[in-house]
Amino acid sequence: MKLAVYGKGGIGKSTTSCNISVALSKRGKKVLQIGCDPKHDSTFTLTGFLIPTIIDTLQAKDYHYEDVWPEDVIYKGYGGVDCVEAGGPPAGAGCGGYVVGETVKLLKELNAFDEYDIILFDVLGDVVCGGFAAPLNYADYCLIITDNGFDALFAANRIAASVREKARTHSLRLAGLVGNRTDKRDLIDKYIDCVPMPVLEVLPLIEDIRVSRVKGKTLFEMAESDTNLAYVCDYYLNIADQLIARPEGVVPKEAADRELFSLLSDFYLNPKSNTTKSTADEEELDLMMV
Protein backbone atom coordinates (compact mmCIF):
# COMPACT_ATOMS: atom_id res chain seq x y z
CA MET A 1 0.00 0.00 0.00
CA LYS A 2 1.28 3.46 -0.90
CA LEU A 3 0.13 6.56 0.97
CA ALA A 4 0.66 10.23 0.08
CA VAL A 5 0.32 12.74 2.93
CA TYR A 6 -0.50 16.35 2.06
CA GLY A 7 -1.65 19.46 3.89
CA LYS A 8 -1.04 23.15 4.42
CA GLY A 9 2.56 24.13 5.12
CA GLY A 10 3.34 24.00 8.84
CA ILE A 11 0.23 22.00 9.71
CA GLY A 12 2.26 19.10 11.12
CA LYS A 13 2.43 16.68 8.21
CA SER A 14 5.88 15.33 9.00
CA THR A 15 5.18 14.87 12.71
CA THR A 16 1.91 13.13 11.88
CA SER A 17 3.51 11.04 9.12
CA CYS A 18 6.31 9.83 11.39
CA ASN A 19 3.90 8.80 14.12
CA ILE A 20 1.60 7.05 11.64
CA SER A 21 4.62 5.21 10.22
CA VAL A 22 5.61 3.98 13.69
CA ALA A 23 2.00 3.00 14.42
CA LEU A 24 1.90 0.95 11.21
CA SER A 25 5.21 -0.66 12.13
CA LYS A 26 3.86 -1.56 15.57
CA ARG A 27 0.98 -3.28 13.80
CA GLY A 28 3.53 -5.55 12.12
CA LYS A 29 3.92 -3.75 8.80
CA LYS A 30 7.25 -3.12 7.07
CA VAL A 31 7.22 0.63 6.44
CA LEU A 32 9.26 3.02 4.30
CA GLN A 33 8.75 6.75 4.73
CA ILE A 34 9.89 8.96 1.85
CA GLY A 35 10.31 12.66 2.55
CA CYS A 36 9.43 14.72 -0.54
CA ASP A 37 10.53 18.17 0.59
CA PRO A 38 13.69 20.10 -0.32
CA LYS A 39 14.13 20.82 3.42
CA HIS A 40 14.73 17.04 3.78
CA ASP A 41 13.47 17.04 7.39
CA SER A 42 10.49 14.72 7.01
CA THR A 43 12.16 11.80 8.80
CA PHE A 44 13.98 13.87 11.45
CA THR A 45 11.54 12.71 14.13
CA LEU A 46 12.29 9.08 13.24
CA THR A 47 16.07 9.26 12.92
CA GLY A 48 16.98 12.20 15.14
CA PHE A 49 19.13 13.80 12.44
CA LEU A 50 18.90 15.10 8.87
CA ILE A 51 19.78 12.11 6.72
CA PRO A 52 21.55 12.55 3.33
CA THR A 53 19.16 12.92 0.42
CA ILE A 54 18.88 10.72 -2.63
CA ILE A 55 19.68 13.66 -4.89
CA ASP A 56 22.85 14.40 -2.91
CA THR A 57 23.87 10.75 -3.17
CA LEU A 58 23.17 10.58 -6.91
CA GLN A 59 25.13 13.77 -7.52
CA ALA A 60 28.08 12.35 -5.57
CA LYS A 61 27.92 9.24 -7.79
CA ASP A 62 27.54 11.27 -11.01
CA TYR A 63 24.08 9.73 -11.37
CA HIS A 64 25.53 6.24 -11.85
CA TYR A 65 22.66 4.29 -10.36
CA GLU A 66 24.68 1.08 -10.45
CA ASP A 67 27.09 2.59 -7.89
CA VAL A 68 24.37 3.28 -5.33
CA TRP A 69 23.58 0.70 -2.65
CA PRO A 70 20.48 0.56 -0.43
CA GLU A 71 22.51 1.49 2.66
CA ASP A 72 23.60 4.68 0.87
CA VAL A 73 20.09 6.10 0.85
CA ILE A 74 17.91 4.06 3.24
CA TYR A 75 18.31 4.77 6.95
CA LYS A 76 16.75 2.88 9.84
CA GLY A 77 14.52 4.99 12.06
CA TYR A 78 12.72 4.48 15.33
CA GLY A 79 10.42 1.47 15.53
CA GLY A 80 12.08 -0.19 12.55
CA VAL A 81 10.73 2.35 10.05
CA ASP A 82 13.04 2.76 7.05
CA CYS A 83 13.62 6.35 5.97
CA VAL A 84 14.50 8.07 2.70
CA GLU A 85 14.77 11.77 1.90
CA ALA A 86 14.29 12.67 -1.75
CA GLY A 87 15.72 16.15 -1.32
CA GLY A 88 15.12 18.71 -4.01
CA PRO A 89 16.58 21.06 -6.58
CA PRO A 90 18.30 24.31 -5.55
CA ALA A 91 15.93 27.08 -4.51
CA GLY A 92 14.34 28.71 -7.53
CA ALA A 93 15.57 26.07 -9.96
CA GLY A 94 14.46 22.67 -11.16
CA CYS A 95 11.32 20.66 -10.45
CA GLY A 96 10.39 18.80 -7.30
CA GLY A 97 8.37 16.32 -9.31
CA TYR A 98 11.51 15.31 -11.19
CA VAL A 99 13.22 14.64 -7.85
CA VAL A 100 10.36 12.41 -6.70
CA GLY A 101 10.53 10.53 -9.99
CA GLU A 102 14.29 10.01 -9.63
CA THR A 103 13.75 8.75 -6.08
CA VAL A 104 11.19 6.16 -7.16
CA LYS A 105 13.39 5.18 -10.11
CA LEU A 106 16.39 4.57 -7.85
CA LEU A 107 14.39 2.60 -5.28
CA LYS A 108 13.09 0.40 -8.08
CA GLU A 109 16.64 -0.07 -9.37
CA LEU A 110 17.58 -1.23 -5.87
CA ASN A 111 14.57 -3.58 -5.79
CA ALA A 112 13.51 -1.74 -2.65
CA PHE A 113 10.24 -0.25 -3.85
CA ASP A 114 8.37 -3.56 -3.63
CA GLU A 115 9.92 -4.85 -0.40
CA TYR A 116 7.63 -2.88 1.88
CA ASP A 117 4.07 -3.44 3.04
CA ILE A 118 3.51 0.30 3.19
CA ILE A 119 5.32 3.22 1.56
CA LEU A 120 4.40 6.66 2.88
CA PHE A 121 5.21 9.80 0.88
CA ASP A 122 5.37 12.91 3.07
CA VAL A 123 4.96 15.80 0.63
CA LEU A 124 5.80 19.46 1.18
CA GLY A 125 3.18 22.08 1.95
CA ASP A 126 0.03 22.73 -0.03
CA VAL A 127 1.91 23.29 -3.31
CA VAL A 128 0.09 20.83 -5.54
CA CYS A 129 1.52 21.80 -8.91
CA GLY A 130 2.08 18.98 -11.36
CA GLY A 131 5.53 18.42 -9.87
CA PHE A 132 4.71 18.04 -6.23
CA ALA A 133 1.49 16.23 -7.03
CA ALA A 134 3.74 13.51 -8.50
CA PRO A 135 3.53 11.23 -5.42
CA LEU A 136 -0.19 10.91 -6.14
CA ASN A 137 0.80 9.07 -9.33
CA TYR A 138 2.15 6.23 -7.19
CA ALA A 139 -0.27 6.35 -4.25
CA ASP A 140 -3.26 4.17 -3.47
CA TYR A 141 -4.52 6.63 -0.86
CA CYS A 142 -4.08 10.28 -0.01
CA LEU A 143 -4.33 11.62 3.53
CA ILE A 144 -4.86 15.32 4.15
CA ILE A 145 -3.64 16.83 7.41
CA THR A 146 -5.65 19.84 8.54
CA ASP A 147 -6.84 21.74 11.56
CA ASN A 148 -10.04 23.61 12.35
CA GLY A 149 -8.90 26.75 10.54
CA PHE A 150 -9.76 28.56 7.33
CA ASP A 151 -6.36 28.32 5.62
CA ALA A 152 -5.80 24.62 6.28
CA LEU A 153 -9.24 23.67 4.96
CA PHE A 154 -8.85 25.91 1.93
CA ALA A 155 -5.58 24.08 1.18
CA ALA A 156 -7.30 20.74 1.80
CA ASN A 157 -9.88 21.61 -0.84
CA ARG A 158 -7.17 22.30 -3.43
CA ILE A 159 -5.48 19.01 -2.57
CA ALA A 160 -8.83 17.25 -2.94
CA ALA A 161 -9.01 18.69 -6.46
CA SER A 162 -5.60 17.15 -7.23
CA VAL A 163 -6.79 13.78 -5.94
CA ARG A 164 -9.83 13.94 -8.20
CA GLU A 165 -7.65 14.78 -11.19
CA LYS A 166 -5.12 12.00 -10.53
CA ALA A 167 -7.91 9.49 -9.87
CA ARG A 168 -8.80 9.73 -13.56
CA THR A 169 -5.73 7.67 -14.45
CA HIS A 170 -5.44 5.13 -11.62
CA SER A 171 -7.25 3.85 -8.54
CA LEU A 172 -6.29 6.66 -6.19
CA ARG A 173 -8.68 7.43 -3.33
CA LEU A 174 -8.79 10.02 -0.59
CA ALA A 175 -8.66 8.03 2.65
CA GLY A 176 -9.76 11.08 4.61
CA LEU A 177 -8.80 14.05 6.75
CA VAL A 178 -6.70 13.94 9.90
CA GLY A 179 -7.26 16.89 12.22
CA ASN A 180 -4.02 17.84 13.97
CA ARG A 181 -3.73 19.70 17.27
CA THR A 182 -7.17 21.26 17.43
CA ASP A 183 -9.67 21.44 20.28
CA LYS A 184 -12.60 21.95 17.93
CA ARG A 185 -13.82 20.43 14.70
CA ASP A 186 -16.88 22.54 13.92
CA LEU A 187 -15.31 24.15 10.85
CA ILE A 188 -14.04 20.76 9.68
CA ASP A 189 -17.59 19.44 9.96
CA LYS A 190 -18.89 22.44 8.03
CA TYR A 191 -16.41 21.69 5.25
CA ILE A 192 -17.18 17.97 4.98
CA ASP A 193 -20.88 18.79 4.85
CA CYS A 194 -20.05 20.68 1.66
CA VAL A 195 -17.39 18.27 0.37
CA PRO A 196 -18.18 14.80 1.74
CA MET A 197 -15.09 12.88 2.87
CA PRO A 198 -14.15 10.77 5.90
CA VAL A 199 -12.41 12.15 8.98
CA LEU A 200 -10.04 9.44 10.21
CA GLU A 201 -9.08 11.15 13.46
CA VAL A 202 -8.88 14.51 15.20
CA LEU A 203 -5.93 14.92 17.54
CA PRO A 204 -6.50 17.36 20.40
CA LEU A 205 -4.35 20.40 21.13
CA ILE A 206 -1.53 18.57 22.90
CA GLU A 207 1.69 20.54 23.38
CA ASP A 208 3.80 17.37 23.44
CA ILE A 209 2.97 16.79 19.76
CA ARG A 210 4.68 20.06 18.88
CA VAL A 211 7.53 19.48 21.33
CA SER A 212 8.21 16.03 19.86
CA ARG A 213 9.25 17.65 16.59
CA VAL A 214 11.84 19.81 18.35
CA LYS A 215 13.15 16.83 20.31
CA GLY A 216 13.49 14.73 17.16
CA LYS A 217 11.39 11.95 18.66
CA THR A 218 8.04 10.37 17.88
CA LEU A 219 5.31 10.34 20.51
CA PHE A 220 5.87 6.59 20.77
CA GLU A 221 9.50 7.10 21.74
CA MET A 222 8.61 9.85 24.21
CA ALA A 223 5.95 7.59 25.75
CA GLU A 224 8.66 5.09 26.68
CA SER A 225 9.89 7.49 29.36
CA ASP A 226 6.56 9.22 30.04
CA THR A 227 3.66 6.77 30.24
CA ASN A 228 1.22 9.69 30.45
CA LEU A 229 1.70 10.08 26.70
CA ALA A 230 0.51 6.57 25.89
CA TYR A 231 -3.01 7.83 25.19
CA VAL A 232 -1.67 10.15 22.47
CA CYS A 233 -0.17 7.15 20.67
CA ASP A 234 -3.63 5.58 20.56
CA TYR A 235 -4.77 8.28 18.14
CA TYR A 236 -2.08 7.28 15.65
CA LEU A 237 -2.73 3.57 16.19
CA ASN A 238 -6.39 4.20 15.36
CA ILE A 239 -5.39 5.87 12.09
CA ALA A 240 -3.05 2.97 11.32
CA ASP A 241 -5.79 0.41 11.96
CA GLN A 242 -8.14 2.19 9.57
CA LEU A 243 -5.49 2.32 6.86
CA ILE A 244 -4.55 -1.35 7.28
CA ALA A 245 -8.23 -2.20 6.81
CA ARG A 246 -7.98 -0.53 3.36
CA PRO A 247 -10.82 1.99 3.62
CA GLU A 248 -13.11 2.50 0.67
CA GLY A 249 -12.10 6.14 0.49
CA VAL A 250 -13.63 8.68 -1.86
CA VAL A 251 -12.88 10.51 -5.07
CA PRO A 252 -13.75 13.98 -3.76
CA LYS A 253 -15.60 16.67 -5.64
CA GLU A 254 -13.95 19.83 -4.39
CA ALA A 255 -15.90 23.03 -3.79
CA ALA A 256 -15.38 26.00 -6.08
CA ASP A 257 -12.94 28.50 -4.56
CA ARG A 258 -15.48 31.31 -4.23
CA GLU A 259 -18.09 28.99 -2.77
CA LEU A 260 -15.64 27.63 -0.21
CA PHE A 261 -14.35 31.09 0.66
CA SER A 262 -17.90 32.22 1.33
CA LEU A 263 -18.71 29.08 3.33
CA LEU A 264 -15.67 29.24 5.58
CA SER A 265 -15.50 33.02 5.98
CA ASP A 266 -19.17 33.09 6.99
CA PHE A 267 -18.23 30.91 9.94
CA TYR A 268 -16.00 33.70 11.26
CA LEU A 269 -18.04 36.69 10.11
CA ASN A 270 -21.34 35.44 11.53
CA PRO A 271 -20.40 33.55 14.69
CA LYS A 272 -23.78 34.23 16.30
CA SER A 273 -25.67 32.26 13.66
CA ASN A 274 -23.31 29.33 14.13
CA THR A 275 -23.68 29.53 17.91
CA THR A 276 -27.45 29.67 17.60
CA LYS A 277 -27.47 26.58 15.39
CA SER A 278 -25.16 24.76 17.81
CA THR A 279 -27.40 25.67 20.77
CA ALA A 280 -30.48 24.49 18.90
CA ASP A 281 -28.78 21.18 18.10
CA GLU A 282 -27.84 20.72 21.76
CA GLU A 283 -31.40 21.47 22.90
CA GLU A 284 -32.73 18.95 20.40
CA LEU A 285 -30.24 16.39 21.65
CA ASP A 286 -31.27 17.06 25.28
CA LEU A 287 -34.90 16.46 24.39
CA MET A 288 -34.00 13.22 22.63
CA MET A 289 -32.05 12.06 25.69
CA VAL A 290 -35.03 12.76 27.99
UniProtKB/Swiss-Prot annotation:
ATP binds at residues 10-15, 39, 180-181. Component of the dark-operative protochlorophyllide reductase (DPOR) that uses Mg-ATP and reduced ferredoxin to reduce ring D of protochlorophyllide (Pchlide) to form chlorophyllide a (Chlide). This reaction is light-independent. The L component serves as a unique electron donor to the NB-component of the complex, and binds Mg-ATP. This is Light-independent protochlorophyllide reductase iron-sulfur ATP-binding protein. Its main location: plastid. The keyword Iron-sulfur applies. Belongs to the NifH/BchL/ChlL family. GO terms for molecular function: 4 iron, 4 sulfur cluster binding; ATP binding; metal ion binding; oxidoreductase activity, acting on iron-sulfur proteins as donors; oxidoreductase activity, acting on the CH-CH group of donors, iron-sulfur protein as acceptor. NCBIfam families: DPOR_bchL. It is found in: Plastid, Chloroplast. It holds the Pfam family Fer4_NifH. The keyword Hydrolase does not apply. CDD domains: Bchl-like (cd02032). Mg(2+) binds at residue 14. InterPro entries: NifH/chlL_CS, NifH/frxC, P-loop_NTPase, Protochlorophyllide_ATP-bd. Its EC number is 1.3.7.7. GO terms for biological process: light-independent chlorophyll biosynthetic process; photosynthesis, dark reaction. Keywords: 4Fe-4S, ATP-binding, Chlorophyll biosynthesis, Chloroplast, Iron, Iron-sulfur, Magnesium, Metal-binding, Nucleotide-binding, Oxidoreductase, Photosynthesis, Plastid. [4Fe-4S] cluster binds at residues 95, 129. It catalyses: chlorophyllide a + oxidized 2[4Fe-4S]-[ferredoxin] + 2 ADP + 2 phosphate = protochlorophyllide a + reduced 2[4Fe-4S]-[ferredoxin] + 2 ATP + 2 H2O. It comes from Porphyra purpurea (Red seaweed). Homodimer. Protochlorophyllide reductase is composed of three subunits; ChlL, ChlN and ChlB. One of its GO terms (cellular component) is chloroplast. It comes from the Eukaryota. Binds 1 [4Fe-4S] cluster per dimer. Pathway: Porphyrin-containing compound metabolism; chlorophyll biosynthesis (light-independent). The lineage of its organism: Eukaryota, Rhodophyta, Bangiophyceae, Bangiales, Bangiaceae.
